[in-house]
Design a protein with these regions (language model features):
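Short, hydrophobic/charged alpha-helical patches characteristic of ARM/HEAT alpha-solenoid repeats
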Residues: 3, 7, 14, 32-41, ...
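Alpha-solenoid helical repeat architecture
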Residues: 8-11, 51-54, 69, 96-99, ...
């Protein structure tokens, strides 16, 4: 193939990788002004579609950036959960089914960040998160199990009803067996 044809595609991929890595780094920085600025720049709207990117590292960094932003700001977390009837949340759950352990760790961490907000936990749970987190407890990777258990714990901390849903999903058995 001609280099002139391949080059724009390689540049496009490099640009996406640089974008998600940079946003993730800015979101995770110590300066809360970055989070506010990223919120004003509507970073979540730009990161959401990258959760379906065929390049796993782009998908993983997008999830990392979204999780970091959602953990830092309840309004951003609300946007993730409520955007187009939970479109971003559904993308996260859908990609968990087929992803590698590195993405699963990042996605479980993101789900934990969303679940920490009391005002959003019930909506996160109604999106089917518990089923996916319980299935991650069966993963052979210890860190996937750890982040999944952490997310389930955050759900439980938001009320008796949610804790009961976690227990009813057989999560305790999976934790004990794991």
């Amino acid at each position: 193939m001609s280099r002139a044809v391949i080059q724009p595609f390689e540049e496009y991929q490099r640009s996406r990788i640089i974008f998600v890595q940079t946003v993730a780094a800015l979101a995770g920085g110590k300066d809360n002004r970055n989070v506010e600025l990223l919120k004003r720049l509507d970073a979540i709207r730009l990161l959401g579609p990258l959760l379906t990117d065929p390049v796993i590292s782009i998908k993983q960094y997008a999830a990392l950036a979204i999780g970091t932003l959602a953990g830092a700001d309840e309004e951003i977390a609300s946007q993730v959960v409520n955007d187009d009837n939970g479109h971003i949340l559904n993308l996260i759950l859908k990609s968990l089914e087929t992803s590698n352990r590195f993405y699963k760790k990042t996605a479980c961490r993101l789900l934990g960040k969303l679940s920490k907000w009391k005002s959003l936990a019930a909506k996160v749970v109604s999106g089917g998160v518990i089923t996916f987190l319980v299935s991650c407890l069966e993963d052979c990777d210890g860190e996937v199990k750890q982040f999944s258990a952490n997310a389930l714990q955050k759900i439980c901390m938001n009320g008796e009803d949610l804790a009961r849903e976690v227990i009813n999903a057989k999560s305790i058995e999976n934790l004990i067996e794991g």
